């Protein structure tokens, strides 16, 4: 049985051999929604204390007539994995939906464009506090929040970006922006690189951008995809977000440190 560490990679390999595009992704997302609604079913299919055959039989009974052969094969693969929790299973399947969308974008030669669009949608939401609240409001239906988002970006971005942006609204345990950031990290993994978000008081010159990429690649040992944010409040220097790592050399940060030291 595959360990938890290897489970995600195993599903990646199965997903990469099977369906691609938004239709396949939406099918996976629909399965995830069913599992999240039916907590007993989710526990049963992720219970590594049960025999693989029993879990396989449950998946057969619930999903065989409702999903495509490609999606069924992906679900079958989950029964050979060891899950730390029921939520780990649904997160892994959610990841496969995201990867399916991005694989479709790559086949259509829109991979980079979709990643850029996702980044800009995230920045759009981050820049509007009222929009952040509205998209995360549990008292509004998912459909209502998705409609609000579509009014802002519909017709301006690709089909792949629309599908992922709409899906990001569904999450109940993370903010919209956090979910989009997760999608961007998946995209960076698929491109065999890491994504760094750099915030500066004014736009970087070509020379500054090249030097920053060079230094980050030296530090991380990985190719870097740089996304830029201009924020005059940082005053000077740069704030770099690299996954869970933060490098803050901004003037605003140094001034704040000085104020704290002075009491």
Swiss-Prot record:
GO terms for cellular component: plasma membrane; proton-transporting ATP synthase complex. InterPro entries: ATPase_OSCP/d_CS (IPR020781), ATPase_OSCP/dsu (IPR000711). The keyword Membrane applies. The keyword Secreted does not apply. It is found in: Cell membrane. It is a peripheral membrane protein. Keywords: ATP synthesis, Cell membrane, CF(1), Hydrogen ion transport, Ion transport, Membrane, Transport. Pfam families: OSCP. GO terms for molecular function: proton-transporting ATP synthase activity, rotational mechanism. Belongs to the ATPase delta chain family. F-type ATPases have 2 components, F(1) - the catalytic core - and F(0) - the membrane proton channel. F(1) has five subunits: alpha(3), beta(3), gamma(1), delta(1), epsilon(1). F(0) has three main subunits: a(1), b(2) and c(10-14). The alpha and beta chains form an alternating ring which encloses part of the gamma chain. F(1) is attached to F(0) by a central stalk formed by the gamma and epsilon chains, while a peripheral stalk is formed by the delta and b chains. F(1)F(0) ATP synthase produces ATP from ADP in the presence of a proton or sodium gradient. F-type ATPases consist of two structural domains, F(1) containing the extramembraneous catalytic core and F(0) containing the membrane proton channel, linked together by a central stalk and a peripheral stalk. During catalysis, ATP synthesis in the catalytic domain of F(1) is coupled via a rotary mechanism of the central stalk subunits to proton translocation. This is ATP synthase subunit delta. It comes from Cutibacterium acnes (strain DSM 16379 / KPA171202). The gene is atpH.
């Amino acid at each position: 049985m595959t360990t938890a560490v290897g489970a995600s990679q195993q599903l990646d390999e199965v997903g990469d051999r099977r369906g691609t595009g938004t239709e396949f992704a939406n099918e996976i997302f629909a399965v995830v929604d069913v599992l999240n609604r039916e907590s007993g079913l989710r526990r049963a299919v992720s219970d590594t204390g049960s025999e693989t055959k029993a879990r396989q039989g449950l998946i057969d009974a619930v999903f065989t007539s409702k999903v495509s052969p490609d999606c069924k094969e992906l679900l079958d693969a989950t029964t050979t994995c060891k899950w730390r929790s029921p939520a780990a299973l649904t997160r892994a399947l959610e990841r496969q939906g995201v990867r399916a969308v991005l694989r479709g974008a790559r086949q259509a030669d829109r991979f980079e464009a979709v990643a850029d669009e996702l980044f800009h949608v995230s920045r759009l939401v981050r820049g509007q506090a009222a929009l952040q609240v509205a998209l995360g409001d549990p008292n509004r239906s998912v459909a209502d929040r998705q409609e609000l988002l579509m009014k802002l970006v519909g017709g301006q971005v690709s089909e792949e970006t629309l599908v992922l942006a709409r899906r990001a609204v569904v999450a109940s345990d993370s903010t919209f922006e956090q979910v989009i950031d997760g999608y961007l990290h998946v995209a960076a993994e698929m491109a065999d690189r890491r994504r760094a978000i750099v915030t500066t008081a004014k736009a970087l010159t070509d020379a500054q951008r090249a030097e920053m990429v060079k230094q980050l690649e030296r530090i991380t040992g990985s190719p870097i995809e740089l996304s830029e944010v201009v924020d005059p409040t940082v005053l000077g220097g740069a704030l770099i977000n690299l996954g869970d790592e933060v490098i803050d050399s901004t003037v605003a940060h140094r001034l704040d440190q000085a104020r704290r030291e002075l009491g």
